[in-house]
């Protein structure tokens, strides 16, 4: 595998340094520190060549848009979060560093761009964390909440706080005078998990323009209520290729428990199934969120074996879906705990994206390329 210096990559691409860095952050060009000078980076030659060849030909706008919306290329502007050089940033702050000390409430204040730190909810909550309760509570608000269109950012931030409290009362029930991570720990009767829950909530609060964030922005762009925005994001998150990827991790662990890690991974790959536990296109050198979380607890033996064997066989490091499932297993949390944690955390990000999209004043309305039967012609004389 050959590598290029920044100067060589820029000459090949005929572009600016900012564009090179953006391509790295989107996972389109792999980069690594220069062994001769760790302050500099080297760029994967094959990735650079592929992009250079792509840009050499003039492509139709519709082709560019179709490729962008599938994966990888920026399709809209956002100041909320980004991934650059294998690091996740929240409004310019390193998310892993921020997670060392911050709570989800402080993360909301940061991502919502000027909001005061959220106070604790006064809701009564439910007996235990429930995703179904969150769906029902949000749906109940949608028909009565005001549309977001035509309202100030200050008014929207106040409503966002209320919507988050609605979600929290369903997903993190309990005493209302405590931070959300403590409420979760108490509802599951696992006080020793509190700090890891805090870190996970912060690390999962936003992740640039992922599938659920895009769904949330589309909903917000139509002027829908913020509760509708979170409802659409939550529905998207439940997909197995997004927030429910932990189920694939659990299935792999179950198979590994019966067959051993190597055979479990071989069987999964032989069946043509993706391994939810490994790799992320935006983190060619490893998911920084996983690294930040895995350093805080001891991996259960089966997870440790799958990690060791899988990273060698697959050639990819474990991702945040693996880390979240492992954390929940390490603290003996309920089986649905990963999606509960993910949903509560990401609600903060969806609301941030909603307010940013509303502020732009733009309706997201792409066109479809028709591939159906030829339209009928009018043969009348």
Model-predicted regions and their roles:
Residues 2-381:
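Hydrophobic alpha-helical bundle cores within soluble ligand-binding/oligomerization subdomains
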């Amino acid at each position: 595998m050959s590598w290029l210096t920044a100067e060589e990559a820029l000459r090949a691409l005929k572009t600016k340094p900012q564009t090179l860095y953006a391509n790295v952050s989107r996972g389109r060009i792999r980069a690594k520190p220069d062994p001769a000078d760790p302050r500099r980076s080297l760029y994967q030659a094959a990735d650079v060549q592929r992009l250079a060849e792509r840009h050499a030909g003039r492509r139709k706008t519709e082709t560019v848009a179709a490729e962008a919306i599938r994966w990888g290329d920026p399709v809209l502007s956002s100041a909320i979060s980004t991934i650059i050089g294998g690091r996740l940033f929240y409004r310019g702050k390193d998310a892993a560093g921020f997670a060392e000390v911050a709570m989800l409430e402080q993360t909301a204040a940061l991502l919502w761009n000027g909001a005061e730190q959220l106070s604790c909810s006064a809701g009564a909550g439910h007996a235990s964390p429930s995703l179904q309760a969150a769906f029902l509570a949000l749906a109940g608000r949608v028909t009565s909440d005001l549309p977001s269109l035509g309202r100030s950012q200050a008014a929207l931030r106040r409503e966002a706080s209320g919507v988050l409290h609605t979600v929290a009362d369903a997903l993190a029930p309990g005493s209302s005078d405590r931070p959300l991570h403590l409420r979760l720990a108490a509802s599951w009767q696992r006080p020793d998990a509190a700090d890891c829950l805090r870190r996970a909530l912060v690390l999962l609060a936003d992740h640039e323009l992922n599938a659920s964030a895009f769904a949330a922005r589309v909903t917000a762009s139509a002027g829908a209520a913020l509760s509708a925005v979170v409802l659409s994001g939550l529905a998207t998150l439940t997909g197995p290729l997004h927030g429910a990827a932990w189920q694939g991790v659990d299935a792999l662990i179950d198979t590994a428990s019966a067959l051993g890690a190597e055979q479990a991974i071989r069987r999964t790959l032989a069946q043509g199934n993706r391994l939810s536990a490994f790799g992320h296109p935006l983190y060619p050198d490893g998911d920084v969120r996983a690294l930040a979380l895995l350093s805080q607890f001891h991996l259960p033996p089966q997870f440790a074996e799958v990690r060791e064997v899988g990273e060698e066989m697959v050639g990819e490091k474990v991702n945040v879906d693996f880390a979240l499932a492992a954390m929940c297993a390490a603290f003996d949390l309920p089986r649905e705990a990963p999606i509960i944690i993910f949903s509560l955390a990401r609600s903060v990000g969806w609301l941030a994206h909603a307010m940013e999209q509303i502020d732009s004043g733009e309706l997201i309305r792409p066109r479809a390329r028709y591939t159906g039967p030829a339209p009928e012609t009018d043969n009348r004389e």
